[in-house]
Amino acid sequence: MEQVAKFSFPSELTSSPSGEKIAWAMNEQGKRNIYFAEGPDFLPKKMTPFMNDDGQEISSLQFSPDGNWLVFVRGGDHGGGNASSTVNAENLTLLPKVEIWKINLSTGVLTQVMEADSPVVGFPARLIFLKGGQIWETDLNSAEKPKQLFEVKGTVNGMQFSPDGKQLAFTVNRGSHSILGVFKDSATPIRWMEASFHRDSNPQWSPDGKSIAFIRTLGGKGAAFPLLEPRHNPWEIWVADLATGKGKELWKSPETLRGSYYNPFLTFATADKIIFESYQDGWQHLYSLSLSDQKVTALTPGNYMVEQIKLSADSKKLTFSANTGDSPQDLDRRHIGSIDLAYNKLNWETSGTGIEAYPVWVGNTGKMAFFSATAQRSHLIALKEGANTKLLQEDLIPSDFPQKSLVTPRQVSFRAPDGTTVYGQIFEKEGGAAKKPGVIFAHGGPQRQMLLGWSYMDYYSNTYSINQYLAELGFVVLSVNYRLGIGYGYEFHRPANGYHQGAVEYQDIKAGGEYLANLAQVNGDKIGIYGGSYGGFLTSLALARDSDLFKVGVDIHGVHDLDGRYDLPETYEVAPDYEKAKKVAWESSPISDLASWTSPVLFIHSDDDRNVNVSQTADLIRRFEELKMPYESILIPGDTHHWMKWENMVRVDQATADFLKKHLMD
């Protein structure tokens, strides 16, 4: 297990606005460092000296507009709640800090800026960030201490410098509403752009700095509508004139469930063209919006989704990843696309059996960099120029990493009882026993998609390595892409009666277990299941409802009690189906079916989990003990949901595999 878990994983890939400079972070068995490369040779250079598996994340990596500096945050867990709260996965007697650092690319000197978070760099080398909820500033070229820029009430988000770096747009959440402000200098009061009782977000400057586009959604709480009936969540695109502060609506979402708001991409391409993302046709796609006539043009039509969208520095091109290509199997892959915005011309930059993600343009050179993986090789940074692509840092693949022995997952599909087509990937090594034990893997999220190769997310690259290890041991593993996940359209992503409203997605997991049990090479009496987070919830649900099918399971930081998804009513007015909704949430929870849970289980949780509170597992274990039900458990003190310390991750991986092997093989 340790060998296959030695994969290095990149993150934070970024490029300078001009020139040929790229940078990224690399996690090498818990040792996280920043690498820098510059054209024409693009030879990677390590820029940081962090040599310990200490659980300290690197995030917010970015170049200064002049390309002379790199800025990043070290510490925290920015994939969970309380992102700026320190992580002490090593259980040190002095807590680590969440700090902003800068790197002078001319000298290589690494300097701490301040204990703070959320940096944003403006032209030419102006740095702002959040400290104590307020905005501070400094100049990267200066040795002077940072100072607070101004004070404002509320929670600050969406900080964006104007193109000339002289003004700052931001939003402030004040509970019932959010407003868009512009700061110029300490002598000028903050100007509020088209302030209203709505929630304004995602401010984006026009290229000429004369206007700001933003997204507007409803404010307040509104009436107590039924909780179990899906409702349209409207949103609008507005633009505010900087000179007057007045705004106007440019576009309003269709009044359909598909048209609902879900935090889409938004940017200016030209002074008259806005690019935005919408689910309105049933798939996550890009659209252009003309300011002059409000005409909307679809840029990426087809039955696939786009994500990880990046605009070029000159605003002439977009790039993104998508699950489409020449083969039906590309539905479970990612390839890179691009759009020439002058002609709205769509091009596909990559194809084949690999996984490519997180593309960035390299300045205005036409080159691009992105994550690249296969079914066997984990992600590295790739550089593409024209038809030629080269990999960077192949030397980081450990000599004992079992790349050549890893299997290629194969795509399968099956039907749930209600007729829904469900996709998955089978991991199986050739040979071995005539009848092999089977394991279902349930991913977390749930807004995730497992792929026919290494995932572009570090958490799921780890679970991919577990699936490979289980296949090596002789298991047949089926990774199920159940409903609520992405990649298969809106209705699959947002089904009725999901999660606490009925857990309709569980039937996909059960159908996967039955599909696996009925394979000719699988022993149907030896089926196990494991999963983390939402997958932990589904694991416990499987064991509680169907112990006759799922003979053993490993529940990693799962959710077990959904009753708390609805707050207790504090006013006279409550949803007409409030009591029914509470009952459905209870019945959707694993704890409601403990009487039929007979299969062995291993519970694993860390106690600084910011995504699923450790109390979810503590409460379930208490219930087990009160009912005198057997279980095994592992508590990881100090770590988070994302196993920030590699040693802890490997311990969890090995324990998962050992528990399944003990009950299904030994």
Tell where the protein language model's regions lie, with residue ranges.
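Surface-exposed loop and turn segments in beta-propeller and other repeat-based domains
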Residues: P49-D53, K248-P264, D395-P409
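A flexible loop/linker signature enriched in serine peptidases of the S9 family
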Residues: A25-Y35, M51-E57, V73-W101, L110-V120, ...
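Hydrophobic beta-strand positions that form the internal "hydrophobic ladder"
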Residues: I22, G67-L70, L127, L168, ...
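Serine-hydrolase catalytic core recognition
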Residues: W348, A357-D666
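Residue-level detector of Asp-centered blade-edge/turn motifs that repeat once per structural unit
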Residues: P17-S18, P65-D66, G122-F123, P163-D164, ...
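Beta-strand-rich domains and repeat architectures in extracellular enzymes and scaffolds
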Residues: E2-R32
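Short loop/turn segments that connect beta-strands within beta-propeller blades
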Residues: E38-F42, N104-G108, L140-A143, K184-T188, ...
